Amino acid sequence: MFLDTEFLKNEEISLRLVELSEADPARKWSPAYHFAICDSVGREIGGCNLRLGHSEALYYAGNIGYKIDEPYRGRHYAGKACRLLFELARRHGMEYLIITCNPDNWPSRKTCEYAGGGLVEIAELPEDNDMRVEDGETHKCIYRFSLRGTRAGS
């Protein structure tokens, strides 16, 4: 199910595999890769993950999550990590990905645009959605990314 990830690097960053998560249907969780984002000298500067497949839960949670540590923000590292993950998703046969963020999270919205996503909608979360129930969130920006023609590091 899981593939080799050694190719997930470019001149600026590399993704170091930290953990693999199997699917958990009872919790509506998909199989996932979890990575540390490292800069060109190997210093950890953040993290990201790729959740495989498509479902209602992933429509709202997204296929990719990312976080860049404060001192390293503003350099497009999250967008560059997303672009590397696009190739891994393609190798899993995925033709598109969804990335979501809160409507007031302007840095994340800019990351989605930088990585080539198109805003599909600002969706209201279903009443029973975990992000609504547990975190009090009500809406998500839904960005769609076509994987046709995407190559690692592009």
Please annotate each region the language model reported.
Residues Y59-E70:
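Conserved acetyl-CoA binding element of GNAT-fold acetyltransferases
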Residues F2-Y59:
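Acetyl-CoA-dependent GNAT
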Residues T100, G118-D135:
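Conserved catalytic-core motifs of GNAT/GCN5-like acyltransferases
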